[in-house]
């Protein structure tokens, strides 16, 4: 781990899950936390490929085995954070819920990362990003006029409203513990996390420029100066020239600067102006439009593919005194195998009891010696 990272010395147990919780662990690991993924010996769909495992290690725990549970509890005693991605009550039914674990380790920050609101009508339901956005209200505003809501890829719910919000809660709890010495339970879910991120559009709903059905408002595709346009080569450019000075530069770049045109904010002319812009943008390739607008304030940007964006990738935030670890490593499908790094973790976390533990050569399951009866 880095010698001067902001989370150096913070020990995190990340119960193995899908995208949101591994992402939360990834952010913490990138900033120096010692993140250990707790893997199950088997999964219903075979071993998952966790590509969000940068700077992490793995320990395999069978939570239904008393000896393996004892090993898990030994790690909990020295951990700072535990990330629980399961549905409400799952860990408590195993006797490993926050009630027990925070009593075992009063400094522990037990972070729930649920899908739906735990006390809401869908609290025990299965779901994915699209379901959470649907219930949060966000999906209702994403899409074109007279079309169904459009799935916006699984970024907003899973990673922003889920994983990143969970990290925020963990950091708040770490700050509180710094002044009080006490851990606490952090409860996050992707519905409320996403809804919180949508505070501004929710507050603006029904007000000027945001008072019409989906696809007929300023920021959802109705305005000709806030739209995505196709270019001659089948690529796209994004236009976001709202302010008058930027709009003037947009018109200049399109060759319309000296033409007599309708007033920018006259909605009655927006459809005609959009049609006009569409024809002009199709007259040049994306790169030709880049030559026109790059370096100007016309607010016209190329829609780039993954292999075209600026490299190297940067960390979430850049800190002058306590930088993150390298986030460009393991970019191409990294993998931390089950149990990888287990012996090193035990040596660093619990050296005084390491001799009392053993790892099964085949399953990689960690247990305390002398107990192996299934619950």
Region roles according to the model:
Residues 1-42, 109-111, 196-375:
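Acyl-CoA thioester-binding alpha/beta core of soluble enzymes
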């Amino acid at each position: 781990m880095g010698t001067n990272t902001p989370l150096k010395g913070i020990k995190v147990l990340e119960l193995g899950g899908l995208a949101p919780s591994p992402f939360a662990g990834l952010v913490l690991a990138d900033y120096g936390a010692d993140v250990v993924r707790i893997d199950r010996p088997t999964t219903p769909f075979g071993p998952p490929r966790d590509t969000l495992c940068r700077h992490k290690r793995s320990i395999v725990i069978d939570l239904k085995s008393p000896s393996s549970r004892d090993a898990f509890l030994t790690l909990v005693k020295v951990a700072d954070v535990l990330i629980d991605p399961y549905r409400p009550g799952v860990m408590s039914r195993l006797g490993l819920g926050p009630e027990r674990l925070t009593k075992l380790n009063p400094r522990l920050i037990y972070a729930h990362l649920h899908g739906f609101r735990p006390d809401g009508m869908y609290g025990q339901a299965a779901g994915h990003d699209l379901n959470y956005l649907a219930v949060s209200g966000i999906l209702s505003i994403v899409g074109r006029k007279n079309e169904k809501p459009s799935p916006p890829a699984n970024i907003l719910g899973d990673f922003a409203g889920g994983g990143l919000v969970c990290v925020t809660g963990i950091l708040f709890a770490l700050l509180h513990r710094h002044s009080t010495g006490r851990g606490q339970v952090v409860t996050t879910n992707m519905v409320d996390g996403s809804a919180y991120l949508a505070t501004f559009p929710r507050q603006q709903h029904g007000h000027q420029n945001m008072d019409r059905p989906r696809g007929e408002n300023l920021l959802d595709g109705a305005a000709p100066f806030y739209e995505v346009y196709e270019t001659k080569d089948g690529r796209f450019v994004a236009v976001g020239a709202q302010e008058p000075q930027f709009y003037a530069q947009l018109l200049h770049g399109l060759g319309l600067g000296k033409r007599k045109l309708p007033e920018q904010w006259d909605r009655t002319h927006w459809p005609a102006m959009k049609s006009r812009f569409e024809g002009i943008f199709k007259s040049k390739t994306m790169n030709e439009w880049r030559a026109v607008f790059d370096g100007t304030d016309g607010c016209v940007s190329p829609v780039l593919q993954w292999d075209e964006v600026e490299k190297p990738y940067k960390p979430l935030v850049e800190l002058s005194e306590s930088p993150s670890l390298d986030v460009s490593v393991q970019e191409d499908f990294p993998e931390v195998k089950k149990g990888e790094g287990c012996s090193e973790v035990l040596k660093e976390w619990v050296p005084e009891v390491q001799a009392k533990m053993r790892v099964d050569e085949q399953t990689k399951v960690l247990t305390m010696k002398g107990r192996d009866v299934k619950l």
